[in-house]
Amino acid sequence: GISVQADNVNLLHGSNVLTSAIDGTAGNISFEVDTLRSNVGADGIPLSGAAPVTIASTSTGQGGAGSISFAGKAGEPADAVLLSHTHIVTGVTNAVDPTVVPGNIAMTAQRVELANGTAVRADTTGGADAGAITLNVDTLKTQSGPDGRVLISSDSHCGNQCVGGQAGYITLQGIPGFTPPSTRLYRHVTAPDSEPNRAITYYFAREFDLRGTDIHSDAIGNAPGGIVMMRTNGQASLIDSGVSVTTQDFTINDNKPNGQPAQNQGFSRIDIMGRDIVLKDSTIKANAEVSDIGSCPLCQGGPSAGEIWLRAEHSFTADNSLIANTGHGRAQAG
């Protein structure tokens, strides 16, 4: 693997940090820093016209990808991770073994900023599960730029007649161990009159400000979609942005094609919590698709397009935005 430890790390103008394998497992990449800037100047402004920086752990065929992590020293969060026109990638291409451990991506920092065509991707093709992406932050800001929109994706692309893998979990939240935990009690949906007895602990970030950003956890090819979770006790703003989860040709409560149980019973979900939730020119979408309407495997599985939960403590605002839960080819909406 590759490990970088320094107070300040600057990656500029097409620099690459790579580990890869063919029919083997790629190594891990870790950064332990106070501040990491990638194609960002000392003044915090993205560099204009800079070639993309790539940080990637990838494999092809039999093996799995490694993981990529950004954090501070000695278990502390970093002060800042600032990325412009930067590609962070863990991926398995043409996976032969659908049970390989996926490559995950984690950022733990007080401030994370993703700008100008930055992509954070834990995608797979060929049947392996996609990796998880976890951003543990106090504040998260994203902004599109001349080099494109910001992308955060954990997709499983398999195609027709392929043993599909599950799309991954994408979690945007506070910093466990540093952000005070918040535990809430819930009733089970099947027993609405019972006393709340299910405890769930959250870590809330201070603020999310997402602009020109696409977040998706989509499965293509006989596989369940993933889950996108956002947790803040401040404002969650999505401006000119989209969030999607997609399940294709998968029966809820079934095993995945590789025989392993699906996470969350195969239900995909978008779950956003905040004091205020603001959508402007944005789309929130949960999809289910059946490619072969003759067999229609999803028809027997109950709601299969997943769920959309928008939980605002104070206010919810949607301006020229779409919230959609859809089923295609006889698939059922959630």
Region spans (language model):
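Extracellular and secretory-pathway beta-repeat/beta-biased strand scaffolds
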Residues: 1-334
